[in-house]
């Protein structure tokens, strides 16, 4: 007897429907075909034990199972449930009637308990697009999958519960989630606020410009000047996620198994801050069983690298292509995966090995050669991709002792949102372009063309600072954002002057300046 059940294989954000074909004949052999990995091959023992604890015997027969399409690699234990149901169906324990109506995924414990799986949300989206009536998942994944509308999602605790449901012996209620309500209720404000930051108005301004245009930013300053503190407050001034951005971000975290307990939608922009000892694979993704890296987990949010020169130089260099293309293609012998990674890159660093170069209150013990070698840990091509380079001075006592709080994040966020609305209108006819940082060269010529006076100012800056062509484009993008914040359609010389001031690390005299 031949029975078919349906499940899914996740490859990056791409989901493929997998048909589980089970045939029982006379004999005692067990054959599993279809490029399953070790976890799939080991499923036989889990399924046999789960059946026994559920009150069913594993059939003594020649069992042949094929996972179609056979040329697609299947990985993980989420195939346990469809395999078990297929075997039970072929053995006559479950009627075939409903099997074609449902997609199902889940790992089985030896006692028949369904364990949570990764990627429930993208699988649910695939099930809806393939017009399945419903999706059967472990109970812990039900709310995550139920975010997808027009699909019945059933969260099950045990294999026995699934058997009863498919055999019309029980009528469980599908899990229902009001997606929009869930999304807006979870849009809580950030715990940090720029009102807590005393002084550093120039840095707050740089962060505001970065948030308004989606620009990458690096802060350079001595220890204790507030670099990390201000970076952690950046999400408080970013525009809120849209529902489509939330779904895309949640899918990535779902695939990585990083969704928190009872979290069905990520409604806040991610803020990822990996340690400087992170490996290349952990940063960009991949591995034996491919997983999204930190750059993809930061998609639609912020990737913050504190103490940037302490990162391995080869690890930092792999950021160059993702920063430019906003997606990462990982190609290995057994797979090729593409993950989105459109994030704001924010970094901080000390100005020298001891940390006090240019600090008027501390003596720097580093030689010019040591300082230059330290700065050279950040390559020119990587710096070119950072739109805003901001120097931070220590906060003087008179600013620290002020009783009055700084400008609150809510007020800064209002200006950022207004600037983003201008950009949304500007790029409404351009697919995949949402902010000034994403402009192509053609768009720069169309939307960020300076005046004649501005061109002369740029020419002087290019010659004096020896800026690259990429830095030239970055200046125009930042100037366009500054003009948007000012509500100006035309990029004025003062907007360009401020943008040029954010290219401080492009200057070759860092080790000779002696001050910020």
Regions found by a protein language model. Name each.
Residues 208, 265, 269-270, 280-303, ...:
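Conserved alpha-helical scaffold flanking the Walker A/P-loop in AAA+ ATPase domains
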Residues 33-44, 59, 66-76, 290, ...:
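Basic, amphipathic alpha-helical bundle interface domains used for macromolecular binding and assembly
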Residues 219-260:
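Walker A/P-loop
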Residues 245-279, 286-287, 393, 434-442, ...:
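Conserved inter-motif catalytic segment of the P-loop NTP-binding fold
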Residues 18-24, 283, 387-390:
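Short beta-strand elements
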Residues 300, 306-307, 318:
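Walker B catalytic acidic pair
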Residues 1-218, 222-228, 331, 471-472, ...:
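Peripheral, non-AAA+ core regions of ATP-driven protein-machinery
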Residues 221, 285, 307:
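The Walker A (P-loop) glycine that initiates the GxxxxGKT/S ATP-binding motif of P-loop NTPases
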């Amino acid at each position: 007897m031949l029975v078919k059940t349906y499940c899914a294989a996740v490859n990056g954000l791409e989901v493929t429907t997998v048909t589980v074909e089970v045939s029982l004949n006379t004999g005692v052999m067990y054959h599993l075909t279809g490029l399953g990995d070790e976890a799939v091959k080991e499923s036989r023992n889990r399924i046999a034990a789960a059946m026994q604890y559920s009150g069913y015997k594993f059939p003594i027969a020649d069992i042949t199972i094929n996972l179609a399409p056979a040329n697609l690699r299947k990985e993980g234990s989420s195939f346990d449930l469809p395999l078990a149901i297929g075997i039970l169906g072929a053995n006559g324990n479950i009627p075939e009637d409903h099997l074609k109506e449902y997609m199902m995924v889940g790992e089985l414990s030896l006692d028949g308990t369904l364990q949570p799986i990764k990627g429930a949300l993208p699988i649910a989206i695939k099930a809806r697009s393939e017009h399945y009536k419903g999706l059967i998942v472990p109970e812990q994944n039900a709310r995550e999958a139920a975010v997808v509308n027009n699909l019945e999602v059933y969260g099950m605790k045990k294999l026995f519960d699934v058997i009863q449901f498919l055999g019309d012996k029980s009528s469980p209620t599908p899990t229902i989630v009001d997606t929009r309500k869930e999304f807006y209720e979870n849009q809580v404000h950030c715990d940090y606020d720029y009102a807590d930051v005393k002084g550093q108005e120039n840095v707050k301004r740089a962060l505001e410009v970065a948030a308004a245009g989606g620009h990458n930013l690096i802060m350079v300053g001595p220890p204790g000047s507030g670099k990390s503190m201000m970076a952690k407050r950046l999400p408080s001034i970013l525009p809120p996620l849209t529902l489509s951005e939330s779904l895309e971000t949640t899918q990535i975290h779902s695939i990585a198994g990083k969704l928190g307990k009872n979290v069905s939608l990520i409604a806040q922009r991610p803020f990822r801050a990996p340690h400087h000892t992170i490996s290349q694979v952990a940063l960009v993704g991949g591995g034996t069983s491919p997983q999204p890296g930190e750059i993809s987990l930061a998609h639609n949010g912020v990737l913050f690298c504190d103490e940037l020169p302490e990162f391995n130089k080869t690890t930092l260099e792999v950021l160059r292509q993702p920063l430019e293309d906003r997606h990462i293609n990982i190609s290995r012998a057994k797979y090729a995966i593409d993950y989105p990674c459109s994030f704001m890159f924010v970094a901080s660093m000390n100005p020298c090995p001891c940390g006090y170069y240019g600090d008027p209150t501390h003596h720097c013990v580093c030689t010019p050669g040591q300082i230059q070698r330290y700065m050279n840990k950040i390559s020119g091509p990587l710096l070119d991709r950072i739109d805003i380079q901001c120097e931070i001075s220590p906060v003087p006592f008179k600013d620290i002792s002020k009783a009055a709080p700084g400008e609150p994040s809510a007020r800064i966020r209002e200006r950022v949102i207004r600037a983003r609305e201008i950009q949304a209108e500007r790029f409404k006819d351009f697919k995949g372009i949402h902010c000034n940082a994403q402009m192509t060269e053609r768009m720069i010529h169309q939307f960020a063309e300076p005046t004649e006076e501005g061109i002369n100012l740029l020419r002087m800056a290019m010659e004096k600072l020896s800026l690259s062509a990429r830095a030239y484009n970055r200046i125009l993008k930042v100037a366009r954002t500054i003009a948007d914040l000012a509500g100006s359609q035309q990029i004025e010389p003062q907007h360009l002057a401020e943008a040029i001031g954010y290219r401080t690390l492009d200057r070759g005299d860092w080790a000779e300046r002696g001050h910020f």
